[in-house]
From Swiss-Prot:
<keyword id="KW-0472">Membrane</keyword>
<dbReference type="Pfam" id="PF13632">
    <property type="entry name" value="Glyco_trans_2_3"/>
</dbReference>
<keyword id="KW-0333">Golgi apparatus</keyword>
<keyword id="KW-0328">Glycosyltransferase</keyword>
<feature type="transmembrane region" description="Helical">
    <location>
        <begin position="495"/>
        <end position="515"/>
    </location>
</feature>
<dbReference type="InterPro" id="IPR001173">
    <property type="entry name" value="Glyco_trans_2-like"/>
</dbReference>
<feature type="binding site">
    <location>
        <position position="182"/>
    </location>
    <ligand>
        <name>substrate</name>
    </ligand>
</feature>
<dbReference type="GO" id="GO:0051753">
    <property type="term" value="F:mannan synthase activity"/>
</dbReference>
<keyword id="KW-0961">Cell wall biogenesis/degradation</keyword>
<comment type="function">
    <text>Possesses glucomannan synthase and mannan synthase activities in vitro. Mannan synthase consists of a 4-beta-mannosyltransferase activity on mannan using GDP-mannose. The beta-1,4-mannan product is the backbone for galactomannan synthesis by galactomannan galactosyltransferase. Galactomannan is a noncellulosic polysaccharides of plant cell wall.</text>
</comment>
<dbReference type="InterPro" id="IPR029044">
    <property type="entry name" value="Nucleotide-diphossugar_trans"/>
</dbReference>
<protein>
    <recommendedName>
        <fullName>Glucomannan 4-beta-mannosyltransferase 1</fullName>
        <ecNumber>2.4.1.32</ecNumber>
    </recommendedName>
</protein>
<feature type="transmembrane region" description="Helical">
    <location>
        <begin position="355"/>
        <end position="375"/>
    </location>
</feature>
<keyword id="KW-0812">Transmembrane</keyword>
<feature type="transmembrane region" description="Helical">
    <location>
        <begin position="471"/>
        <end position="491"/>
    </location>
</feature>
<comment type="similarity">
    <text>Belongs to the glycosyltransferase 2 family. Plant cellulose synthase-like A subfamily.</text>
</comment>
<feature type="binding site">
    <location>
        <position position="184"/>
    </location>
    <ligand>
        <name>substrate</name>
    </ligand>
</feature>
Length: 521
């Protein structure tokens, strides 16, 4: 009894002995580092806000900066020879719900049929789905579309491997440009007529990237949150990068490449899970320019289940960090681009947007600030924990004005997702076990509507409690709630208001009540 009592009594004493010489200095250092990263992120956001304002005021649209005359189609002497031969690649993997949408949209493009080659690169492992896709390709081939259905013996290199394999065919040598669409993307008929002229009339342009438009943005609150983040990416980040230095990350789909630029850059590589970004950086280091067309929009689908969204965010966060690790010295040693472009790629593109933005969000707002509740000697200035994040949040709202009223929920959800993004970023930087893990984002198409309309399926829609739980989120929620109660009882800064709301957000995600729930078949 004396031992137990002594041990219990010794805990506060041990804490007080460790607190002053160890905990306080370490926490102050962590606060200083996080404040520095917050300032860097704030300056980056302000820089983009100023530039995008200038772009809009000065009307620096792509059609004003580059020649983009329409390709003539009324010359009887030239006929269709005025149109370059374009290759369309549609990579897919077990895309039962959406394969018809992308194939149908691509086959409906307004382009001479003898100047268009469509490749369906099917890596599906389900033989039933493979047969369905093959039949769909045959159906369009019978209508006169030059479409080929191609499979591989293995999935080596995943999407990059499929695209690389598709470029090896002899007929590709006749193609000047290649457009890529993921299986859930549906380009409008005039897509090529609005993008190809930029490549035809400007020999230094390698890539034309279109904007994504989300057909299921109103599916649930989670898809609205995604729309807000991605709209900011397209309307601000891509627009600014295109206008300032003609460089940005290829989004992997809804874009058109000059084939010669792809070949000069070394083609598709599967060394990371962001083969699109990899190719874009290598092409940029060769001196090629990119153009972003915000007024050309391609319909696509957002992941509406939390599991699919989480896997997607892991790939999108881990891949860039891993690519940064592998390409840093290659960028530094490059002789073809200016020092300012190198700084933009290393600092703005990689360090701030792909690494610091993820890490500071989780470390500062979900760990460090709550931890200071227990160590009142460590103070955080209001400009660091209130003003800067508020301004950054407001700046993010410009991409989706219709969702301005959801900003409060958006920032809470972004903080929750920063847990996974930070973890993925560190895995990529350290090139740990899951650094090259590729999980195809689940697309539901109309499946959810069809299943939910069935009463028999509705009875099976309830998942087992254990399958819904996200233990890590529940752990963070417990930590935040503990900090909140302690602050409510002993604190003076009213941090408990934020801590309770943020803890509730982690708890809701932790018990699986976010996104849509797909009824079991």
């Amino acid at each position: 009894m004396e031992v137990n009592g002594g041990g219990a009594a010794g805990l506060p004493e041990a804490w007080s002995q460790v607190r002053a010489p160890v905990i306080v200095p370490l926490l102050r250092l962590a606060v200083a580092v996080c404040l520095t990263m917050s300032v860097l992120l704030f300056l980056e956001r302000m820089y983009m806000a100023v530039v995008i304002s200038g772009v809009k005021i000065l009307r620096r649209r792509p059609d004003r900066r580059y020649r983009c005359d329409p390709i003539p189609d009324d010359d009887p002497e030239l006929g269709t020879s005025a149109f370059p031969v374009v290759l369309i690649q549609i990579p897919m993997f077990n895309e039962r719900e959406v394969y018809q949408l992308s194939i149908g949209a691509v086959c409906g493009l307004s382009w001479p049929s003898d100047r268009l080659v469509v490749q369906v690169l099917d890596d599906s492992t389900d033989p039933v789905i493979k047969e369905m896709v093959r039949i769909e390709c045959e159906r369009w081939a019978h209508k006169g579309v030059n479409i080929t259905y191609q499979i591989r013996e293995n999935r080596k290199g995943y999407k990059a491997g499929a695209l690389k394999e598709g470029m090896k065919h002899g007929y590709v040598r006749e193609c000047e440009y290649v457009a890529i669409f993921d299986a859930d993307f549906q380009p409008d008929p005039d897509f090529l007529r609005r993008t190809i002229p930029f490549l035809v009339h400007n020999s230094d342009i390698a890539l034309v990237q279109a904007r994504w438009r989300f057909v299921n943005a109103d599916e649930c609150l989670m898809t609205r949150m995604q729309e807000m983040s991605l709209d900011y990416h397209f309307t601000v980040e891509q627009e600014v990068s295109s206008s300032v230095c003609a460089f940005f990350g290829f989004n992997g789909t809804a874009g058109v490449w000059r084939v010669s630029a792809v070949n000069e850059a070394g083609g598709w590589k599967d060394r990371t899970t962001v083969e699109d970004m990899d190719l874009a950086i290598r092409a940029s280091l060769k001196g090629w320019k990119f153009v972003y067309l915000g007024d050309v929009q391609v319909k696509s689908e957002l992941p509406s289940t939390f599991k699919a969204f989480r896997f997607q965010q892991h790939r999108w966060s881990c891949g860039p960090a891993n690519l940064f690790r592998k390409m840093l010295m290659e960028i530094v040693r490059n002789k073809k681009v200016t020092i300012w472009k190198k700084i933009h790629v290393i600092y703005n593109f990689f360090l701030i947007r792909k690494i610091i933005a993820h890490i500071v969000t989780f470390a500062f707002y979900c760990l460090i600030i709550p931890a200071t509740i227990f160590v009142p000697e460590v103070r955080i200035p209001k400009w660091g924990c209130v003003y800067i994040p508020t301004i950054i949040t407001l700046l993010n709202s410009v991409g989706t004005p219709r969702s301005f009223h959801l900003l409060f929920f958006w920032i809470l959800f972004e903080n929750v997702m920063s847990l996974h993004r930070t973890k993925a970023t560190l895995i990529g930087l350290l090139e740990a076990g899951r650094a090259n893990e590729w999980v195809v984002t689940e697309k539901l198409g109309n499946a959810l509507k069809m299943k939910s309309s069935s009463k028999s399926s509705a009875k099976k829609s309830f998942m087992r409690v254990w399958d819904r739980l996200n233990v890590t989120e529940l752990g963070v929620a417990a930590f935040l709630f503990s900090c909140g109660w302690y602050d409510l009882a002993f604190g003076k800064d009213h941090f408990f208001i934020y801590l309770f709301f943020q803890g509730a957000a982690f708890f809701i995600v932790g018990i699986g009540y976010v996104g849509t729930i797909v009824p079991q078949s």
